[in-house]
Every structure is written in structure tokens, then in C-alpha cells.
Amino acid sequence: MTARGTASRFLTSVLHNGLGRYVQQLQRLSFSLSRDAPSSRGAREFVEREVTDFARRNPGVVIYVNPRPCCVPRVVAEYLNGAVREESLNCKSVEEIATLVQKLADQSGLDVIRIRKPFHTDSPSIQGQWHPFTNKPTALGGLRPREVQNPAPTQRPAQ
């Protein structure tokens, strides 16, 4: 796919993160799993063993566990910007679920898309971007404006 066909945006920081204090973007994790389904065994073990450690490491994240007779276990992540991500935990081990949940906690909730420029500022310079000839005098060899240069000598007809 070409660059014009893919979504892109400029580099921004979510809620100006890093200025002041860091605010984790993950707001809520909801686990839906079955008590007896074999596909939910890894999710049940994660909830029994690892979810308290995750909650201690991430005190700003609210964790809900919904035991219900469902066929596919899943985790739903809700972010501060309103984005909702749903991931399936079907037949995954405890380690795979732990890495998935940590990945959801580290994300900002924004879609992963192409960044147009690797730099961004809210107050761009009035002078423009720097280049090697920024502070060089313009009176060098061929850099003078045309109206300042001496015109070519004109030949006068003989009288």
C-alpha cells in the first residue's frame, strides 16, 4: 500500500505526558472468563496468581473480573481517551496473558499509525528551520540578488 493510502498523523503526546507528571493511559481492565471451560484455564490461573501483582504495580488501573458462562475468555481495556481494546485470551498460558496485559497497560489507546514527522513543537520558530546558510552573508560570489549585480556592459554603436 502506498504512503497516501495509509493513515498518518503528526507526532503528539497524549495529554502532554512527560510535562509535569506521568499519567498512565489505561483506565480499566475487565476480564470475562468461564469457571469451568478448558479454554479459560490460563485466564483463571492468571486471575488467581498474577492479577494482584499487576494491581500493585499499576495502582491507577481498575481491574474487574466477571466470571460468566462464556465460551471465549477475553480482556477489555479502556483508556482515558475513550478507546476500547478487546483481546481474546482463548487457550493462552499465564505468561502470554501477563505479557498481553502489560502491553495493554503500556499503550496509550491510540491506533498504531505512520508518523509524518519525527519531531513536533507547539510553538514553531518564526525564523524557519535552520540550514547551513542561515547566518552567512549573501554578498558571496553568486549569492547576490540580480538587481545588485553589475549589469553586463552594453556596446555603444560607433558614431
Swiss-Prot record:
| Molecular-function GO term, any one | structural constituent of ribosome
> By which gene is this protein encoded?
MRPL43
Q: Where is this region: Disordered?
A: 123-159
The entry's protein name is Large ribosomal subunit protein mL43
> Which SMART domains does this chain map to?
L51_S25_CI-B8 (SM00916)
Where does the UniProt annotation place the signal sequence?
Answer: none
Q: Which family does it belong to?
A: Belongs to the mitochondrion-specific ribosomal protein mL43 family.
Its subcellular locations are: Mitochondrion
Which GO CC terms are listed, alphabetically?
Answer: mitochondrial inner membrane; mitochondrial large ribosomal subunit
- In terms of superkingdom, the source organism counts as Eukaryota
**Which pairs are disulfide-linked?**
none
